[in-house]
C-alpha cells in the first residue's frame, strides 16, 4: 500500500495494534506523534517517513516495536526495541543496521548523513537505484548489483598519480595531489635530489 496521512494527533493511529508491511507511508502530524498505537507496532519491508513537531516522537508504540528490512525516517530521536536489517534516520543522521537491501529507489538528500558501520552491509539489488546527494560514510560493505549515483562523493585517497575513488560508487573524483617528496636527500656525482615517495619523481636541488 501507499499512504499519505496528515493529522493533528496522530496522523496514523492503531488502537490495539498497528502492522505495516510492503508499504510506503508518509505520515505528518501537526500537533504530536505522527504514527502511534496503544499496542504493538510491526513494520516490515516498508519505507516509512514520520514527521512530527519539534521534541515529539515520530513513531511510537505503547508496547513493543519490531522493524525488519525497512527504511525508516523519523524527525524524532526515538530508538526501537527490535530493529533488524534496516536503515534508521533520526532527523538528518542515519545508520545502516545489519544487512540492508534497498527496495526500489532510495535517496540520501543533501542535508543528510548515512553511516554504514563496520560489520553492516548495504545491498543495491538488480533494478534498484541508490542516489547520494548528501554524505555516506562507508566503513562497512557495499554490494552493488543495481545503480548508484553520487552527486557528492566520499572516501578514497588521492595521490599525485591517482585521483580519489569514491567508496560508494567507485568513480574517480577530485584532483591529483602534489608530489610527496621525501625529506631524505639523494645524490650522485653531479646532483642532489629528493624523490617523491609515491611516483619517484625527482626534485633537484
Model-derived regions, located:
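Extended, small-residue-rich solenoid/repeat segments and analogous flexible loops
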Residues: 87-103, 108
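Long terminal segments
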Residues: 67, 78-92
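Polar/charged side chains located within well-ordered beta-strands of beta-rich proteins
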Residues: 65-68, 74, 90, 106, ...
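Thrombospondin type-1
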Residues: 150-205
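Tandem-repeat architecture and repeat-register "anchor" residues
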Residues: 1, 15, 21-23, 38, ...
Amino acid at each position: 500500500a501507499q499512504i499519505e496521512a496528515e493529522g493533528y494527533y496522530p496522523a496514523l493511529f492503531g488502537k490495539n495494534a498497528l502492522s505495516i508491511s510492503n508499504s510506503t507511508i508518509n505520515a505528518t502530524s501537526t500537533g504530536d506523534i505522527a504514527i502511534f498505537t496503544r499496542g504493538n507496532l510491526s513494520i516490515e519491508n516498508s519505507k516509512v517517513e514520520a514527521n512530527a513537531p519539534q521534541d515529539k516522537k515520530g513513531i511510537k508504540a505503547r508496547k513493543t516495536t519490531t522493524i525488519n528490512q525497512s527504511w525508516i525516517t523519523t524527525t524524532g530521536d526515538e530508538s526501537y526495541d527490535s530493529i533488524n536489517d534496516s536503515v534508521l534516520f533520526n532527523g538528518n543522521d542515519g545508520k545502516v543496521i545489519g544487512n540492508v537491501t534497498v527496495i526500489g529507489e532510495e535517496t540520501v538528500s543533501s542535508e543528510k548523513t548515512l553511516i554504514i558501520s563496520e560489520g553492516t552491509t548495504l545491498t543495491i539489488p538488480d533494478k534498484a537505484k541508490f542516489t547520494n546527494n548528501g554524505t555516506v560514510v562507508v566503513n562497512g560493505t557495499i554490494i552493488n548489483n543495481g545503480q548508484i549515483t553520487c552527486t557528492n562523493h566520499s572516501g578514497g585517497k588521492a595521490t599525485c598519480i591517482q585521483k580519489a575513488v569514491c567508496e560508494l560508487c567507485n568513480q574517480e573524483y577530485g584532483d591529483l595531489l602534489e608530489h610527496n617528496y621525501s625529506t631524505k636527500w639523494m645524490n650522485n656525482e653531479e646532483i642532489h635530489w629528493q624523490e617523491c615517495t609515491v611516483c619517484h619523481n625527482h626534485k633537484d636541488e
